[in-house]
């Protein structure tokens, strides 16, 4: 591995892993369950890196042996050919292991393991933008279904001509934020609306916000900053909706954020759900601020994920989705059915590459 700084990092990881292994073998740690869990978690997070590093060291040793055999087999063409083939295979293996190690050494996003709230908000384009927001809702629901994630509707504002002015989903499952964080931004659609009699192509947009779930400890909200009003819910509940004001409208005065929640059956449940959404929105605002600070120092190719950033165009006429961060085109029809894994993996790979370049520049 040519980069000395990577070897130094790997040796440091190896030392930490060995120390955590020794700690776990100490009988005294069993008397402190919290410390036991902390040490076990650290060790587990380093295990793949250490195992891959060991494979790399073994491959290096085998390569040295194969090169020695190649050197000594000058008078034996058959042996020389076999040794040359082994050298080539080992060099390819080492390249693969080195690339994997570089990715494993990248800093982990602390939010990657979290569930999310995904907000879809109609942008420019009037009724067509609301219909487009509904199409995106279906796309993400189908994708989540394919990932075996759980999806729950938290809040919705339906549009008169179909679709939604705004909708918020809760998505729970494994590694949800690590994938869907790349969906934040402006999604533009170019198509002939069903309401267009002249057959002209219109351009509309919807904005996606991806908010990792947070608890009370991570975001403090002063009760004095909240204004709450109630209303009669228009949702499920039979005659109850006409008698009891179960819907909750929360207004956060410092930021101007308003959350309207109607999906739960009681006012208390809707208030708790609205506070959950508000905490997630405030946390996302802080993440955006931090990302903007970072991006001013390092322009990421994948982009900042800012709400104002146009990340993708869906062109119906050409059956094409263009991801502007990647400069790549994908097929439209499968994407609308929730087949967006290739796009997300391409974003992940490009983000990793940008981080690797930054790591090399700082070394």
Curated annotation (Swiss-Prot):
Signal peptide: none annotated. InterPro entries: PCRF, Pep_chain_release_fac_I, Pep_chain_release_fac_I_sf, Prokaryotic/Mito_RF, RF-1. The keyword Transmembrane helix does not apply. The modification N5-methylglutamine is found at residue 239. One of its GO terms (molecular function) is translation release factor activity, codon specific. It is found in: Cytoplasm. Keywords: Cytoplasm, Methylation, Protein biosynthesis. Pfam families: PCRF, RF-1. The keyword Disulfide bond does not apply. Its main location: cytoplasm. GO terms for cellular component: cytoplasm. Methylated by PrmC. Methylation increases the termination efficiency of RF1. Peptide chain release factor 1 directs the termination of translation in response to the peptide chain termination codons UAG and UAA. Belongs to the prokaryotic/mitochondrial release factor family. PANTHER family: LD18447P, PEPTIDE CHAIN RELEASE FACTOR APG3, CHLOROPLASTIC. This is Peptide chain release factor 1.
